[in-house]
Amino acid sequence: MIRLVLLFVILPLTSYSDKHIPYYKSLAHDESWLRHYPENQDLNKQTEKFLLTEENMPVKVIEEFRNSWSSYTDWYRIELFNGIQGWIAHNQLSKKRTLLILEDIELYALKSYDPESWMTIQKGIILAPKIVNLLEVKETMVKISIPKGNKSSVKGWIPIDYRLWGVSDKEMQTLND
């Protein structure tokens, strides 16, 4: 009886996640291997699927894998913007939130826009493809920053639509509830 109780107490701890899947992270390095399955000791490199070469590229986490002896998630099953899926080691991902601009999009100075209003100030056009930093999510727009170099950046608002990849439906539902 005691073993059964311990089993129910211990098992949830090994599969617990503080995030609701799916959620987004970004690549931490400019070279990361996407694998067929979560295996680090592959001497013949048979699990390697693709070499991802874009640091800060947003990825969607769709599954977590934790070894029974580990206190943290060891591997993440991710999906890329084009639908490709695979496994990546925990140290290859960052909590930094980024977005991928899939098509050219307008950058606005304010968090609302109306083509008929004099209050709408267009700061420019972001040419795709482009990775940008996600700063804030509002109902229909996101605040972003675009690195310019020399530690400076351009900040502004862009509408949330099909031209973006990296904002989840759950984030939008949370804002609208």
Please state what every model-predicted region is.
Residues 18-26, 41, 60, 69-116, ...:
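Boundary regions of SH3-family modules and the immediately adjacent low-complexity/disordered segments
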Residues 141:
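Conserved tryptophan-centered aromatic signature that marks the ligand-binding surface of SH3
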Residues 44-69, 117-138:
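Conserved beta-strand/loop element in small beta-rich adapter and peptidoglycan-binding domains
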Residues 32-36, 107-110:
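Short polybasic amphipathic segments
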Residues 34, 56, 78, 129, ...:
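Short alpha-helical segments in extracytoplasmic peptidoglycan/chitin-binding modules
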Residues 28-30:
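Start-of-domain marker
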Residues 2-13:
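Sec-dependent N-terminal signal peptides
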Residues 13-14, 37:
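Short, intrinsically disordered, charge-balanced linker/junction segments flanking boundaries
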